[in-house]
Design a protein with these regions (language model features):
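Conserved P-loop NTPase motor core of helicases/translocases
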Residues: 2-140, 179-200
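Conserved helicase motor core of SF1/SF2 NTP-dependent helicases
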Residues: 127-146, 150-246
């Protein structure tokens, strides 16, 4: 199965991936499991364990593999000058020249997509998933797990939702609401776009998670019944005030 793990923030994505890695270190080491972390800058990754799984690092490994394979073919060509082997050598040479461009950003999206599709687990932020320069346009997943979904706006959530056959949303609309920079509204209106209506602003500011939670059947949602963040008396008070003592 192809699994997508996303959140609005990098730290949430990395916490999940780091937990998976620590629980399955041997499986990741022998490549029984594989993951790729999509991120614009490696410095945004919060856990050192996860930096080895960035798409750019996977690409560097792939280049070395292709280069070694090419040199093997080159050696074979010296002993076998058949037409078939010569054509194979020429195509391999073209492929090697293609992937050895100076900058990772110059690599065709088709190659990035090929690398991404070879992994079972992909981690990214909601907006990072929409980056057209990372070869994600055609990526599809069997399941998307979206953490901190209560903090994401409708556009942010729709990006991963539309990529997956099944979706698991994890969040709490009673906690932090979606974060939208107020300057965004001003910038949109300053760009000669029609003034934002109340409904437009509500779409950006109200949690899409809350909308879904209110409308889906009870059989499709559940609530955790255990917390570790606060003393029991405080937890009971919050449960009574915001969660109907559930």
């Amino acid at each position: 199965s192809k699994i997508l793990i996303v959140s609005q923030q990098n730290i949430a994505v990395d916490n999940v991936l780091n937990g998976l890695y620590n629980e399955n270190i041997e499986l990741f080491k022998d490549n029984s499991h594989s993951m790729v972390r999509i991120v614009s800058n490696e410095n945004k990754i919060q856990h050192e364990n996860i930096k080895q799984f960035t798409l750019e690092n996977w690409f560097q490994n792939y280049k070395e593999m292709v280069k070694n394979r090419f040199y093997t073919i080159e050696q074979d060509k010296r002993f076998d000058e058949s037409l078939e082997n010569s054509l194979y050598f020429d195509k391999s040479s073209e492929w090697l020249n293609l992937i050895y461009k100076d900058d990772f950003k110059d690599i065709p999206n088709e190659i990035k997509e090929l690398l991404i599709s070879s992994h079972q687990i992909l981690g990214a932020t909601c907006m990072g998933l929409a980056n057209k320069s990372l070869g994600l346009d055609l990526s599809e997943f069997d399941i998307a797990i979206i953490d901190e979904a209560g903090r994401a706006t409708a556009p942010e959530l729709l990006i991963p939702i539309l990529r997956a056959k099944k979706v698991v949303l994890i969040g709490d609309h009673n906690q932090l609401p979606p974060t939208v920079d107020k300057q965004l509204f001003k910038d949109i209106e300053d760009d000669n776009i029609d003034k934002l209506t109340f409904e437009d602003k509500e779409v950006l500011e109200k949690s899409f998670f809350e909308e879904l939670y209110e409308k889906i059947p009870n059989s499709n949602k559940m609530m955790l019944n255990e917390q570790f963040r606060m003393p029991k008396k405080i937890g009971d008070l919050i449960s009574e005030l915001f969660y109907e003592s559930m």
